[in-house]
A protein has these predicted regions:
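Feature recognizes metal-dependent phosphohydrolase scaffolds
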Residues: 1-221
Length: 221
């Protein structure tokens, strides 16, 4: 439903429910057909696959209530918002969790939200602003939807890949769940790219570093 509300997210390829063939137990994704256990989709309305059934609405409302009324979760999330940020510049270093979206040529990827174009630092500033509005501001569906985009959007600085949760959960063929990474992960070890990113955030020291979360750590190496 979020994807349908926001064509600017450019995530129509993640609309998969209408591609399930309930008769022969398969799903076709990007031209490839895979077997799938259709018994797991007994409540799916093939005429309106992206509408929740009354029972599903009840489950979602119960989950929403539990999350919204968890005092411990409120405390933890409040701490993250009060102390954290999408990125931080500290001691001539740049700290961020995911990536700085790049295009295939290693330039900052330009993305459009709210009829404005963002790239590099301006994209992360925009993400931080909307995340805070979603938490502190009056209820706004667009802001809440953007929080979902930050989790799984192709050009989200917190994600950096074409996330395939559906394929991992329901398709046994592992080739279906290979996630295409943002070009950032191809370039990020190159000095000129690191320097370009640091300059974008007004960091010019010869001892500046990018401290990048969301990257695997090899144990015992």
């Amino acid at each position: 439903q979020i994807i349908k509300r926001h064509p600017e997210y450019k995530m129509d390829d993640r609309l998969l429910l209408h591609k399930i063939n309930m008769e022969d137990g398969t799903i076709t994704i990007e031209g490839a057909t895979y077997p799938i256990d259709t018994s797991l989709f007994g409540s799916l309305d093939k005429d309106n696959p992206y509408e929740l059934s009354p029972g599903e609405v009840h489950v979602m409302n119960s989950l929403k209530y539990s999350f919204a009324n968890s005092s411990r979760l409120k405390k933890h999330v409040g701490f993250l918002y009060s102390k954290g940020a999408i990125y931080i510049c500290c001691n001539n270093n740049l700290l961020f969790h995911g990536c700085i979206p790049l295009d295939k040529d290693g330039n900052f990827e330009v993305v459009e939200f709210d009829d404005n174009l963002y790239k590099g630092k301006s994209l992360l500033d925009y993400a931080d602003k909307i995340a805070r509005r979603a938490y502190y501001g009056e209820p706004n569906q667009n802001n809440l939807d953007f929080m979902w985009y930050l989790w799984g959007g192709k050009k989200s600085p917190l994600c950096g890949r074409n996330i395939k949760t559906f394929e991992r959960a329901f398709i046994d063929d592992e080739t279906a769940s290979v996630e295409e990474k943002d070009p950032y992960y191809h370039y990020y070890l190159e000095e000129k790219i690191a320097t370009m990113i640091l300059r974008e955030f007004k960091l010019y020291s010869d001892i500046s570093h990018i401290i990048n979360g969301h990257t695997p750590t090899l144990i015992g190496v």
